[in-house]
């Protein structure tokens, strides 16, 4: 007995169920040139296969793989609201590659996951173009990914992102903060904005303050300042690591300054950060004023203008600053390491 449709009856298709295979194929064709620009030594097979292949370089003697995964958080809600999808791809890459960088790892390759209810090829291609741009900045290959069209799972016009980065570091060169001692210097590298953290509070402030997001804000639109892509620190910091001993690094993400710096400190030391060592950028001044946010809350939610912290010996501080400035980074000496008193927090902003 045949299960085929009888004469005059149209059978159901995947498109009837809400999944457009042709749109998915069109997206793959659109993004292949973006991915191709990210290819690097080691890539054996990339987009299109069941699995991507990567061969570790012979320059590594005792390689340790370092992996990281992250998303963009509720910054995506603003992307939907503003219908701008050109920055969140770089955000996605930055969140993972900056994380694995702090252990001294060179990012090797990246994979992305794009999930939606109905696939809009133009939107998805714009996002993935941003992902490829982030991979170029980080020097890693966009080696594969997944586009999941799942009807009824997401509202029309919305999507979610996840990213996965894998890097490698020589075992003897892993940076874990174990050599940090009192007297060491804390350097802060400038952020490009709020990066990809604290956006639930950003959105709440926008909801309460109801600003004109197209209004001029220090020479750009307010929405441009809010949606600025996360800075990728990979190339300048890998160069610094080859130049002088870096004792520890902290990517300032969710938890702000006061909760991320302790992640690289031993229990017997404290980082004392001086708030007057750098100027709070205009975006954070605006957020604090419009939301009447307390200083302590700012420091544990936002990066407050410092996207990456680097800890070096006092005698290496000036050389590190000069090296990073020559690489195009804005950097300040923002604090020092001291012995931790009993019951004292591991990061203090004074």
Swiss-Prot record:
Keywords, ordered alphabetically: ATP-binding, Cytoplasm, Ligase, Nucleotide-binding, Purine biosynthesis
PANTHER family cross-referenced by the UniProt entry: TRIFUNCTIONAL PURINE BIOSYNTHETIC PROTEIN ADENOSINE-3, TRIFUNCTIONAL PURINE BIOSYNTHETIC PROTEIN ADENOSINE-3-RELATED
Compartment(s) where it occurs, according to its Swiss-Prot or TrEMBL record: Cytoplasm
Pathway: Purine metabolism; IMP biosynthesis via de novo pathway; 5-amino-1-(5-phospho-D-ribosyl)imidazole from N(2)-formyl-N(1)-(5-phospho-D-ribosyl)glycinamide: step 2/2
The protein's name in its UniProt record: Phosphoribosylformylglycinamidine cyclo-ligase
Originating organism: Cupriavidus necator (strain ATCC 17699 / DSM 428 / KCTC 22496 / NCIMB 10442 / H16 / Stanier 337)
Similarity comment: family membership: Belongs to the AIR synthase family.
The keyword Transcription regulation appears for this protein: no
Gene designation: purM
């Amino acid at each position: 007995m045949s299960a085929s449709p009888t004469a005059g009856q149209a059978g159901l298709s995947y498109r009837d169920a809400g999944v457009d295979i042709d749109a998915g194929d069109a997206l793959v064709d659109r993004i292949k040139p973006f991915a191709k620009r990210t290819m690097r030594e080691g890539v054996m097979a990339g987009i299109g296969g069941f699995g991507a292949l990567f061969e570790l370089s012979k320059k590594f003697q005792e390689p340790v793989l370092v992996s990281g995964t992250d998303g963009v958080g509720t910054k995506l809600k603003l992307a939907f609201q503003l219908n701008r999808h050109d920055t969140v791809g770089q955000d996605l890459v930055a969140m993972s590659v900056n994380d694995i960088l702090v252990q001294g790892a060179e990012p090797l390759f990246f994979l992305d996951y794009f999930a939606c209810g109905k696939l809009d090829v133009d939107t998805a291609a714009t996002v993935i173009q941003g992902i490829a741009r982030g991979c170029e900045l980080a020097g890693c290959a966009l080696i594969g990914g997944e586009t999941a069209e799942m009807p009824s799972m997401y509202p029309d016009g919305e999507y979610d992102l996840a990213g996965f980065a894998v890097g490698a570091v020589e075992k003897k060169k892993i940076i874990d903060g174990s050599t940090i001692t009192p007297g060491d210097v804390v350097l802060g590298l400038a952020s490009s904005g709020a990066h990809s953290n604290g956006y639930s509070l950003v959105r709440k402030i926008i909801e309460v303050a109801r600003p004109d997001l197209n209004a001029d804000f220090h020479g750009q639109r307010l929405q441009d300042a809010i949606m600025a892509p996360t800075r990728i620190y990979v190339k300048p910091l890998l160069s610094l690591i080859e130049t002088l001993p870096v004792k520890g690094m902290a990517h300032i993400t969710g938890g702000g300054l006061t909760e991320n710096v302790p992640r690289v400190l031993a229990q017997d030391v404290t980082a004392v950060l001086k708030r007057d060592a750098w100027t709070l950028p205009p975006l954070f001044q605006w957020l604090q004023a419009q939301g009447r946010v307390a200083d302590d809350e700012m420091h544990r939610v936002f990066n407050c203008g410092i996207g990456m912290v680097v800890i070096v010996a006092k005698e290496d501080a000036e050389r590190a600053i000069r090296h990073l400035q020559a690489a195009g980074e804005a950097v300040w000496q923002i604090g020092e390491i001291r012995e931790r008193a009993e019951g004292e927090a591991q990061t203090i902003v004074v």
